[in-house]
Every structure is written in C-alpha cells, then in structure tokens.
C-alpha cells in the first residue's frame, strides 16, 4: 500500500493539468460549451423529449462575411458573452465552427424559439462591434423538423442558408 501524502507542488509526468469541470466543458475563448458537449446534450435531449413528448429547439447563428473577412478573437469572445446573456440558465450554447454558433433551447415551442432566435440575431448585430452587421439564423424544432440530431442540424443549416440576411 502506498501513501501519497500531500500533492507535490510540481507537475507530475502525465498530469500536467488537472481539468476542472469548467475547463472540460467550456471553451476558454467564448465561455460557451465545447462542441462535443453541446452535441452530447442535444443527443440526450432527443432521447428525453422523445420519451416524454416534449419539444426543444436548435438554433444556429452565422455572420454574413465578405470574402476574405474573418472574425477576430475579440469579436468571438464578445459573441460568446452576448449569447450567454441572452439565454436561460437551462439552455446551452456552443461555437460549432469558427463562424457558426448554436444554442439548444430546452422545453421550447416554436414561438418561443423563434422569438429567442431573432432577438439574439438583433443583439449580435448591434453589440458585436467590429463584426458583421447582419447575421443569418437557422432554427430546427424537435420533433417537427426531425427526430434525430443529424436531421435537426441539417434543417438548421438549410434554414441558415435560406436566411437572406434581412435586417432585424
């Protein structure tokens, strides 16, 4: 039997960092959930809502960028703040790609999800300085638009590409 005693001040080989739940689940740059956790929670929500006959929504937001234009790290951090402030504590958000952001709205019907999607679109357009002025939005509802994660993401992506970027 080995006695470990107090942890060493230095780092042990193979244990360079001890990950807290926040660093494992949240992206440092945005403060939003990491993509793997977001997708995991959407899968769980599909199972839960199928079992209990509930609805939820997945929303994608994406800035309209000119060719060669990119979001700065500062703009991405501000986007994370704006999205976190605009969601309920029960909802989750993530940065899926460099320019694509998503939210999982738990227990949300169509009208609620649509209101959140467009309110957030307006907040992003007005509060992310240095970023693009218009944002595209894609909304998919469970079970109306699909009953599995790939289908819901495809529907949200399709609606995102159909959004003509009309100002909010």
Name what the model sees in each region.
Residues 62-67, 142-146:
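Short, internal active-site loops enriched in acidic
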Residues 95-106, 130-159:
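A short glycine-enriched loop-to-beta-strand structural element that forms part of the catalytic core
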Residues 62, 105-110, 124, 128:
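Hydrophobic, well-ordered secondary-structure segments
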Residues 53-55, 90, 134:
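A structure-centric signal for secondary-structure junctions around beta-strands
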Residues 27-46, 50-58, 64-84, 94-98, ...:
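Conserved long alpha-helical elements within nucleotide-processing catalytic cores of c-di-GMP signaling
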Residues 1-46:
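Signal-transducing coiled-coil linker helices
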Residues 48, 85-92, 121-131:
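Short catalytic/binding micro-motifs of nucleotide second-messenger systems
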Residues 162-167:
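The C-terminal output helix
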